[in-house]
Design a protein with these regions (language model features):
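RNase H-like, Mg2+-dependent phosphodiesterase core
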Residues: 1-295
Length: 295
């Protein structure tokens, strides 16, 4: 059976991108009892990215998990630019995120073959991330009307693309695991939008889990979904990509205003940061909406 896990990073901040990731696995079966809070496989931590990385801390745990997963499918990005090109769907990096290139070779060189074994045994297959910078985010927010709708649509597009890329027939068994989208419990409408010719059967809709069946597919939207490994790895990819891009964003602004303290982009600190860069933003003739997410 095929397993697709999805999750995001950057749903709440005002600065920086929203990153949504889908990972594809192929397994003989999937064990729902394999709940994890954080697990260690040959020195590689797999778990909720919010537990593996804290603002201002080391990215090492995320780096090792993400790069081990990629190494298991023969992908070895030398730097973050290559990572964005290989994994991410983004046409061009905005100028505030353009440099410096961050080398990943030191961490890649420290990985041991046994650390790949977990991903090989779990048949990790592919990863796809959508990187949405503030200007595009604001346009999509206006189009979809809410953050929850925006996230649901981006997520379903990634799922559909993964299925299409592999030519998977919907008669095959496909299990899609998603972290819940902003507390939403009902996903019938969004599934109908992307699978118009399919009959959507509601199996369960609750605060904890929402389950839907259509032909050979099952969708599970799970509260605290990072407890499932395919969702956890998607969470790690999303967070790692976002944090690498935020390092570039802070580098740009520290070149413009050497005394400014870096920001993680979340609302309270984002207000402080915006107040400090507002005049420089005018000098750069850059509209606030190009870097500030409206919600």
């Amino acid at each position: 059976m095929y397993i697709i896990g999805t999750d995001e990073a950057g749903y709440g901040p005002n600065f920086g991108p929203l990153v949504v990731t889908a990972t594809l696995w192929r397994m003989a079966e999937f064990d729902f009892s394999s709940v994890i809070t954080s697990a260690n496989f040959a020195g590689i931590d797999i778990g909720d990215s919010k537990q593996l990385y804290h603002s201002g801390g080391s990215l090492d745990k995320l780096s090792k998990g993400v790069l081990s997963a990629l190494a298991s499918i023969g992908i070895f990005p030398k730097n973050d630019t290559e990572l964005f090109d290989i994994v991410g769907k983004v046409s061009q990096l905005p100028f505030m995120f353009a440099e410096p290139e961050i080398s990943l070779q030191k961490i890649s060189g420290e990985l041991k073959p046994e650390s790949f074994n977990f991903f090989l045994s779990g048949s990790f297959h592919k990863v796809l991330s959508q990187i949405i910078f503030p200007a595009e985010y604001n346009s999509l927010l206006e189009y979809y009307g809410s953050k929850g709708e925006l996230l649901s649509n981006i997520t379903l597009k990634l799922v559909v693309e993964l299925i299409a890329d592999l030519g998977i027939d919907l008669c095959e068994q496909i299990l899609v695991l998603c972290d819940k989208h902003g507390g939403r419990n009902c996903y019938t409408d969004i599934l109908t939008r992307y699978f118009q010719d399919e009959l959507i059967k509601v199996k369960e809709q609750s605060r904890e889990i929402s389950i839907y069946n259509l032909r050979g597919m099952e969708f599970r939207f799970i509260a605290k979904g990072e407890s499932q490994i395919p969702i956890a790895l998607s969470s790690m990819f999303s967070k790692y990509i976002r944090e690498l891009l935020m390092q570039r964003f802070n580098f740009f602004w520290q070149k413009q205003i050497p005394t400014i303290k870096p920001t993680a982009g979340y609302p309270e600190d984002a207000k402080r940061f915006m107040a400090e860069i507002e005049n420089k933003l005018k000098e750069l003739k850059t509209d606030k909406n190009e870097i500030w997410r409206l919600k």
